[in-house]
From Swiss-Prot:
Consists of two distinct domains, a catalytic core and a N-terminal extension that is involved in tRNA binding. CDD domains: SerRS_core. Homodimer. The tRNA molecule binds across the dimer. Catalyzes the attachment of serine to tRNA(Ser). Is also able to aminoacylate tRNA(Sec) with serine, to form the misacylated tRNA L-seryl-tRNA(Sec), which will be further converted into selenocysteinyl-tRNA(Sec). GO terms for cellular component: cytosol. Its main location: cytoplasm. GO terms for molecular function: ATP binding; serine-tRNA ligase activity; tRNA binding. Its EC number is 6.1.1.11. It is an enzyme of class 6 (ligase). This is Serine--tRNA ligase. It comes from the Archaea.
Length: 455
């Protein structure tokens, strides 16, 4: 939510930002807010004047009573003032509702470094890491997507898609999951169960070492938390509701972590607060019909480890760089080639002022795919959830800044591992960083395991 003072004092800043975001239909909202706010402030001034007059009348009434003089005219005026105040306060309540309607639906103000664009095609790659395995048929596409800035090894054989690897390894049962739950669900099986849990523990250990407090949050939250953490559109497109209850299944641990300190004034000396949440995530994926319908890349349920930071406003941009760096460390340890992209205004969403994505090279698909999002939400969530801090007891509280980043979403990390670490024979060679967590160094195709057992 935006600060009404920003709109009141610098409406052109907000309008320019809406134009950059392509939200031109909301430009008239700013003029409407200014008009409503002007009327609200005029009414408030009248209310304060009337209260002052009423207090003066109370003094006069006291004096007249003491002197035994009539007070009927003063009482009549006092009662008129009470009614006038009630009417003005009622009018201001309605004005406030209208103002809040707009404020709650306006996007965050973007950082000056966010590129202007219309869609994900306008996102800007800013750095690359790793040596990609590239099938010769994907080479030209890879060079274009990596801007010629990434090392690569050309393969004469085409790596399998992760969905084919799942079948080869007997790592998942998608058909039975569809029978039981519908599309975009899966049974994870055998070594991939261990791999999923290993990825969670690996990411968790990395962040605990960096001072993050581990948290398993509630998997369901009340509506005010979701309204505070995200946009209203998500209630239709993303979030599952528990029927008959004021509860919603979380689409990410970010949301219960954002709500953790709702309506609190934090002690400034405790900032930054660093949390690493571990949870399942539940998503409708209503707006993604036809996309990634096979496999486990885009699903209704998955595990995720999430970084969440409450910081001072003046420190939040430094923390944004830190949390994306943390995520990069994790994918470097997993030996997954990737690029970091600066998300453009048209793909940014309403909540973040700036967002980085890590896109892993998927050797089977021949393209980069999103595996991490890291956002600085500045005070947009904090205003909605009323999360403030102060350094001294009598100091006026200020809103914190909130930041979040994926550490690892296990299903997508598994996709990246299966596509990048497979051999021509279909063996998956796990990165060394995971060995102590899995207890094994490779995953064999099912037919190889059967042959080993027979021998």
């Amino acid at each position: 939510m935006l600060d009404i003072k920003l709109i009141r004092e610098n409406p052109e800043i907000v309008k320019r930002d809406l134009i950059k975001r392509g939200e031109t239909e909301k430009l008239k909202w700013i003029d409407e807010i200014l008009e409503l706010d002007k009327k609200w402030r005029e009414n408030l001034k009248k209310i304060n004047q009337l209260r002052k007059e009423r207090n003066q009348l109370a003094v006069q009434i006291g004096k007249r009573k003491k002197a035994g003089e009539p007070i009927d005219d003063l009482l009549k005026r006092s009662n008129e003032i009470v009614k006038q105040i009630e009417e003005l306060e009622k009018e201001n309540e309605e004005l406030k509702k209208k103002i809040d309607y707009y404020l709650w639906r306006l996007p965050n103000i973007t950082h000056e470094s966010v590129p202007v664009g219309e869609s994900d095609e306008d996102n800007v790659p800013i750095r690359f890491w790793g040596k990609a395995k590239v099938w010769e048929g994907f080479l030209e596409t890879f060079k274009e997507q990596s801007l010629g800035k990434m090392e690569y090894e050309v393969l004469s054989w085409r790596p399998r898609l992760h969905v084919d690897m799942l079948e080869l390894l007997r790592g998942a049962d998608l058909e039975r999951a569809a029978k039981v739950s519908g599309a975009r669900f899966y049974y994870l099986l055998n070594e991939l169960v261990i791999l999923d849990l290993a990825l969670i523990r690996f990411a968790l250990d990395k962040l605990i070492e960096k001072g993050f407090t581990p948290v398993i949050p509630p998997y369901m939250v009340r509506r005010f938390v979701e309204e505070g953490a995200t946009t209203f559109d998500d209630f239709e497109d993303v979030i599952y509701k528990v029927e008959g209850e004021d509860l919603y299944l979380i689409p990410t641990a970010e949301h219960p972590l954002a709500g953790m300190h709702a309506n609190e004034i934090l002690d400034g000396k405790d900032l930054p607060l660093l949390y690493v949440g571990v949870s399942p995530c539940f998503r409708k994926e209503a707006g993604t019909a036809g996309k990634d319908t096979k496999g486990i890349f885009r699903v209704h349920q998955f595990h995720k480890v999430e970084q969440f930071v409450y910081s001072r406003p003046e420190e939040s941009w430094e923390w944004h760089e830190r949390i994306i760096a943390n995520a990069e460390e994790i994918f470097q340890a997993l030996e997954i080639p990737y690029r970091v992209v600066n998300i453009c205004t048209g793909d940014l969403g309403y909540v973040a002022a700036k967002k980085y994505d890590i896109e892993a090279w998927m050797a089977g698909q021949g393209k980069f795919r999103e595996v991490v999002s890291a956002s600085n939400c500045t005070d947009w969530q904090a205003r909605r959830l009323n999360i403030r801090f102060r350094d001294k007891t009598h100091e006026k509280p200020r809103f914190v800044h909130t930041l979040n980043s994926t550490a690892i979403a296990t299903s997508r990390a598994i996709v990246a591992i299966l596509e990048n670490h497979q051999t021509e024979e279909g063996v998956v060679k796990l990165p060394k960083a995971l060995w102590k967590y899995t207890g094994f160094k490779e995953i064999l195709p099912a037919h190889m395991k059967e042959k080993c057992c027979q021998d």
